[in-house]
Structures are given as structure tokens and as C-alpha cells.
């Protein structure tokens, strides 16, 4: 029942020209995108985001609740009880978010809530003109180099006009050196490990 209601709301919003600002992938991305379109039509993106943050905080603070939500063996009845408990514990939740919880309970996907919430935050950032990006390096970048790179990316076509870049430094020693830049759904791989892989491929093809 709630699956149909949730999907119908998202579908109506899509027909009205409401589309997520960035394309997400995977099951979590699909749910997050559907919530974005439904919230845009019925309430607001800000309201949905606020409710998700509230619920995420509640779940994070209750280890037992988190464990229960991630239990795939939970019965349909018990999943419904969990949702009712969440709704009662969090006053004035956004309606599309409540419908999302019920859909997740129906489909035994409550364990995906945290990931869906995380994916929705990406949509919310983009909706507010904030583009997320990351630069992966073998060792942490010092503040000076990080700011120089952030400024260069902010002014590049990867970010675009009237957008603000939110850049994080991800450390992965296995890339050996160089860096990997990811902005939105675009990736620039300048890592040493990537160059080694390309060299190995060339060598294999010539042998």
C-alpha cells in the first residue's frame, strides 16, 4: 500500500518537472531520489532533510534500535512496530519521510535507512548549490596545498558557475602517489597506481 503511495507521489513530482539535481546509483540512490521528488512536490526538500537528520541522530544514539533495524529476519509486524515507534519518538516528521519508512518496512529494507539518508544529503547539498568532491592522496595534503587545489577546482568547469565546492581529502596509501579527484559524478585519476596499471596493460599487449 505505502509502496504505491510513495511511488505515485514521486511519479507525479517527476511529471511536474521535478528532478533530482544529481544522478545517484544503487538501491539507496533510487530511494533517495524518489524521496527528493516526492518531498519537492508534497512538502519541501528542507523539511525532508531535517526529518532525516533527526531520525539518523535518534538511531545513532540507540545501538539496540540500530541493530533491530538492520535485522533482516524481523517479521513484517515487528518492522511496522519499529516504524510506529520512530514516528512517535520524532515529532512532526516530514510526510514523505514517514512514507519512506513505511515503504522500507514493507520491503524489508529498513537496514538501508542510514545509507539512504546519506545519499539524500548529497541531493540536498546539490539542491542548495553545494557540490561535493574529494581528492584522494597516499598521504594527507597539508593545508596550503589543499586550499590551492580546492580553489583551482572551484574555478574549474567541474564545479560550474554559482556552485560551491565542498572538498574532502581521502587518504589511501595504496594509490602510491599522485591523486584522484572526484567531483559529483566526474573522476580524474592521476594516481601512480593508475599509471602503473596502464603501463602494465601496455606491456601485456606488446608481449
Curated annotation (Swiss-Prot):
PROSITE patterns: ATPASE_DELTA. SUPFAM superfamilies: N-terminal domain of the delta subunit of the F1F0-ATP synthase. Keywords: ATP synthesis, Hydrogen ion transport, Ion transport, Membrane, Mitochondrion, Mitochondrion inner membrane, Transit peptide, Transport. One of its GO terms (molecular function) is proton-transporting ATP synthase activity, rotational mechanism. This is ATP synthase subunit 5, mitochondrial. Coiled coil: none annotated. It is found in: Mitochondrion; Mitochondrion inner membrane. F-type ATPases have 2 components, CF(1) - the catalytic core - and CF(0) - the membrane proton channel. CF(1) has five subunits: alpha(3), beta(3), gamma(1), delta(1), epsilon(1). CF(0) has three main subunits: a, b and c. Signal peptide: none annotated. GO terms for cellular component: mitochondrial inner membrane; proton-transporting ATP synthase complex. Mitochondrial membrane ATP synthase (F(1)F(0) ATP synthase or Complex V) produces ATP from ADP in the presence of a proton gradient across the membrane which is generated by electron transport complexes of the respiratory chain. F-type ATPases consist of two structural domains, F(1) - containing the extramembraneous catalytic core and F(0) - containing the membrane proton channel, linked together by a central stalk and a peripheral stalk. During catalysis, ATP synthesis in the catalytic domain of F(1) is coupled via a rotary mechanism of the central stalk subunits to proton translocation. Its main location: mitochondrion. The lineage of its organism: Eukaryota, Fungi, Dikarya, Ascomycota, Saccharomycotina. Belongs to the ATPase delta chain family. It comes from the Eukaryota. Pfam families: OSCP (PF00213).
Amino acid at each position: 500500500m505505502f509502496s504505491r503511495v510513495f511511488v505515485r507521489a514521486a511519479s507525479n513530482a517527476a511529471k511536474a518537472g521535478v528532478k533530482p539535481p544529481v544522478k545517484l546509483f544503487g538501491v539507496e540512490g533510487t530511494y533517495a531520489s524518489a524521496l527528493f521528488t516526492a518531498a519537492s512536490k508534497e512538502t519541501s526538500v528542507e523539511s525532508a532533510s531535517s526529518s532525516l537528520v533527526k531520525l539518523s541522530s535518534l538511531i545513532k544514539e540507540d545501538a539496540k534500535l540500530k541493530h533491530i533495524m538492520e535485522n533482516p529476519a524481523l517479521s513484517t509486524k515487528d518492522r511496522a512496530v519499529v516504524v510506529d515507534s520512530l514516528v512517535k519518538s520524532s515529532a512532526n516528521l516530514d510526510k514523505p519521510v514517514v512514507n519512506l519508512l513505511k515503504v522500507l518496512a514493507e520491503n524489508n529494507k529498513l537496514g538501508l535507512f542510514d545509507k539512504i539518508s546519506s545519499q539524500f544529503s548529497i541531493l540536498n547539498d546539490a539542491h542548495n548549490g553545494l557540490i561535493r568532491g574529494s581528492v584522494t592522496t597516499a598521504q594527507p595534503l597539508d593545508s596550503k596545498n589543499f586550499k590551492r587545489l580546492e580553489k583551482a577546482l572551484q574555478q574549474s568547469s567541474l564545479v560550474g558557475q554559482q556552485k560551491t565546492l565542498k572538498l574532502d581529502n581521502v587518504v589511501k596509501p595504496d594509490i602510491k602517489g599522485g591523486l584522484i579527484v572526484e567531483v559529483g559524478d566526474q573522476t580524474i585519476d592521476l594516481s601512480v597506481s593508475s599509471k602503473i596499471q596502464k603501463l602494465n596493460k601496455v606491456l601485456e599487449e606488446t608481449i
